[in-house]
Amino acid sequence: MTKPQDTIWQQIYSGQWYQTHHPQLVEARELAKRLCNELNQLPVSEVTKRQALISQLLPNAKVAATGNDFACDYGINIYAETPVIMGDRVVILDAAPVSFGANVKIEDAVVITSLTHPLEAAKRKAGWQQASPVKIGDNVILCEGCTVLPGAVIPAGAVIEPGKVVTR
């Protein structure tokens, strides 16, 4: 897998537009998708096997539990120093870093995205994207079906209501 110190990652982290078809990014996404698929094939009752896969998929995050149908783009850009609890159908598009504070709970069908696409169709077709980090503070609850957009900073203690969209 590529390392965040590589040039393409530095381009992403600096907020520049980048090509999503870059070979290093394709390789990293393919690995993450394979690990997500393996994780999602295991029953939730297979705690030890699931934790081993989660540790491989999310090497920079402590995760207490994930429900079924977890998905992420890379996994290596998800950060949590204390365990995060995730429900079913959680999607984290982690082109840029997505960081979680302590005691965060993510309910079912939450989407967290750090990437955006250009408005011009030709640039979208060519695979251009831009990413902005997402920061989620301590003791936050992301309720069912909410969406967190690129660049959002959620302060400590916030409760994002079901179905809400966080834009900043």
Where are these regions (language model features)?
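Terminal amphipathic alpha-helical/low-complexity segments used for targeting or macromolecular assembly
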Residues: 1-63
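General secondary-structure edge motif
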Residues: 12, 64-65, 120, 139
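A glycine-rich, hydrophobic loop/mini-helix early in the fold
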Residues: 57-77
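Flexible, glycine/small-residue-enriched loop-and-beta-strand segment within the central core
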Residues: 70-81, 85-154, 162-164
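Gly/Pro- and small hydrophobic-enriched strand-loop and loop-to-helix capping segments
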Residues: 167-168
